[in-house]
């Protein structure tokens, strides 16, 4: 059971992530459609994504591109830590940078492919350190990685963006 301590920033967790052509796309649960969100599709703020390649008919979902975060999301993240727990969340920094521009304090994600069981374990530890112990994101990422290590199948590591904050020790 995770409960935030008083004064602890909030966290947003996104499970499914895809990386392609130097962009990271966040999966939605909305099925891809030619009749919905036409402006967002035309401007490539929403793109079709799928979990696995398979032959037609296509049965994918909408994926949120970095421009969707910048122009279509309302409000600010007010220092929130955004956690991209799926594969490749920080393989490219375009989406992470968009969240920072919208006011997120930090973005945490994997630098490559990650198994479901490993990300579940790592993010559970990360949330414990962020919410139960009230650690800053940089320290929480370091502790979670010390607990679980890189993904045993893919070697990917949990990282924090922006790297300058991680290096300087700022939360």
Q: Which residues does each predicted region cover?
A:
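Domain-scale, conserved, charged regions that form catalytic cores
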Residues: 9-11
């Amino acid at each position: 059971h995770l409960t935030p301590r008083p004064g602890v920033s909030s966290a947003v967790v996104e499970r499914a992530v895809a990386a392609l052509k130097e962009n990271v796309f966040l999966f939605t649960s909305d099925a891809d459609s030619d009749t919905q969100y036409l402006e967002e599709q035309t401007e490539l703020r929403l793109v079709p994504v799928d979990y696995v390649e398979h032959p037609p008919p296509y049965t994918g979902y909408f994926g949120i591109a970095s421009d969707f975060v910048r122009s279509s999301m309302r409000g600010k993240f007010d220092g929130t830590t955004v956690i991209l727990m799926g594969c490749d969340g920080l393989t490219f920094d375009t989406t992470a940078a968009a969240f920072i521009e919208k006011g997120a304090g930090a973005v945490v994600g994997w630098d490559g492919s990650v198994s479901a069981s490993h990300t579940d374990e790592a993010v559970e530890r990360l949330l414990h350190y962020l919410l139960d112990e009230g650690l800053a994101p940089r320290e929480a990422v370091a502790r979670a990685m010390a607990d679980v290590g890189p993904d045993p199948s893919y070697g990917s590591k949990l990282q924090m963006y922006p790297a300058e904050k991680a290096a300087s020790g700022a939360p």
